[in-house]
Amino acid sequence: MDTSDKEYLKKEGYPLMKGAAQFCKAWLVSDKNDNLITSPATSPENQYKLENGFEGATLYGGTADLAMIRECFDKTIKASKVLNIDADFRAQLERDIARLHPYQIGKKGNLQEWYFDWDDKDTKHRHQSHLFGLFPGNHITPSKTPELALACKNTLEMKGDETTGLSKGWRINLWARLWDGNRAYKMFRELLRYVDPDGKKTEKPRRGGGTYPNLFDAHPPFQIDGNFGGTAAIVEMLVQSNENEIRLLPALPDAWDSGTIKGIYARGGFELELYWNNKRLDKLIISSKLGGKSTLIYGNQTKVIQLKKGEIQDILW
């Protein structure tokens, strides 16, 4: 859908998406409120702790499961519409997505990870799988779901920044999606913190993430997720197109007060060049590989563009 390659979507993408959606549908059951939940469920590698001291990992209605299912159903529905096929199955997904157990905000203002408002056994646990809807998912955003976005922010604040490379790479992207460029940049710098492979000259323990001299993300032995996550985060700090619009410099850190980026792609087949000075966007050069319409957002400014295939526009701000 992001490239408008309908042939690929029809032959490869949609069958895979539909199969995943069918699997998820078979996994769902109704709770006492007639909401759909997963059962059994876990939240990857994390555990909860009850007031009576009981610790567990298995439950039902885990937030991470439901976040991924929301994203899967939403994308499958959209793909079905693009291809104009499977209207009956699409209708089933539309009914089911409306019945999914809703997100819950806990007593501490955090996004609940569990079906109930339970505490984590480890309050600083490296995983934040229940924030999937914010990133890499697209259905939680500061503009469209501000209360949920704030709950995600509170969750990240509670967990802190010190974590493994995999998790640090993910959290940089989460902060970028929350439009907090300085926090994202802080963690990006920590991701690049030197780690001695022999553990003799390391500033902080390996569990805190960092980078080996060969630029591999430190864990040990190696977490490529940290490398990929850090790279993705640079893009997310400068351009976001996860809400159908193209948002320019949404999480620009103070440290990058002036700069240029070329060859960055946005959903819909748009290629961008951005030029900024003193933390202000000066110029955008945008071209369309497919032809189409989009909305550009920079701060409080909005511009609607319509480009033909191969057309290039220079836009001054």
Language-model features: where?
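Long, well-ordered core segments of solenoidal/helical folds
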Residues: 16-32, 97-108, 151-161, 188-200
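The feature captures the catalytic groove of carbohydrate-active enzymes
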Residues: 1-11, 25-91
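Carbohydrate-binding/catalytic loop surfaces
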Residues: 35-62, 111-123, 178-179, 217-225, ...
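Long, low-complexity segments enriched in small/aliphatic residues
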Residues: 90-131
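Secondary-structure transition/capping motifs at alpha-helix termini
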Residues: 1-11, 23-35, 143-144, 178-185, ...
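C-terminal substrate/ligand-recognition segments
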Residues: 1, 121-200, 220-236
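Glycine- and aromatic-rich loop/turn segments at beta-sheet edges
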Residues: 29-42, 108-115, 164, 198-218, ...
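Non-catalytic C-terminal accessory modules of carbohydrate-active enzymes
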Residues: 26, 182-317
